Amino acid sequence: MTRGLRIDTTPEEVEVVSDRLWALGAVAISEEWRSDGTVVLRTSLGDDRDLVASLIARELPDVVWVDEDIDLSVADTWKEHVSIVEVTGDLWVRPAWIDTFDAPAPPNATVISIDPGPTFGLGDHPTTRGSLQLLASVIAPGSTVLDVGCGSGVLGVTALVLGAHRAVGTDITPAAIEISRANAAANGVADRWRVSLEPLEVFGEPFDVVVANILAPTLIELSEQLRRLAGRYLIVSGVLDGHDDHVHRALEPLVEVQRIVIDGWATSLLTRPE
């Protein structure tokens, strides 16, 4: 048994709540649809109760949750239901435990191997796919990249494979350190990847590209540092389309120059006005 959490929600809110749990690092989420019209979600965000409480309070302030011992012995069964992710025709993300493609990739395609472990970032979530698409469009040889809320490191590692000179990941989850380093090593870019639990204030020089696939409250909380550190481009995701005006206002004077919407989730490319 593992220390987990239980959230009672509604059919109307279950998708949003689940997506936010995935973004917080859930690896497996069970759903129990009850006859009284409620939906019970069970998952685990780790054994640090103080950290879990702060994450829930910040990202899901309106939900009621309780501690509950849960059986995650079958958690890895989700791996049986994922497949290689086509980001673009030339960029694919392969779960590390899959040896062959469910769909053929072009012979010259870039294929990133990722094992997220207990972190967020396999490449299949709409926010990750949108971030990867925009990242692929702006990475130039020699670029420097900051991946805020890096999780598995899929965004920063992909940037390095695509030609970035150096990438730094930040996260508040200690598991991101080991997992992202392992993924960087698996893709041959460990020497150019650094990951830190330190706040953004410690970074002095801006990066060519900053990518932040995190939820709206955190984007707003970090907006000053995101603006400061984005030398050329800022990619933000983790917000539902049509509900991101407050995020963009917080990021002014940066302006949106491109937007991708996948399954209702918006990913934006911002830059400084000319």
Task: Enumerate the predicted regions with their spans.
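A short helix-to-beta-strand connector/capping loop
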Residues: 60-63, 89, 108, 165, ...
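N-terminal auxiliary segments of SAM/dcSAM-dependent transferases
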Residues: 2-103
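S-adenosylmethionine
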Residues: 138, 172-273
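Conserved SAM/SAH cofactor-binding pocket of Class I
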Residues: 118, 122-199, 203
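SAM-dependent Rossmann-like transferase core, predominantly class I methyltransferases
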Residues: 73-141
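A structural motif
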Residues: 26-28, 164, 231
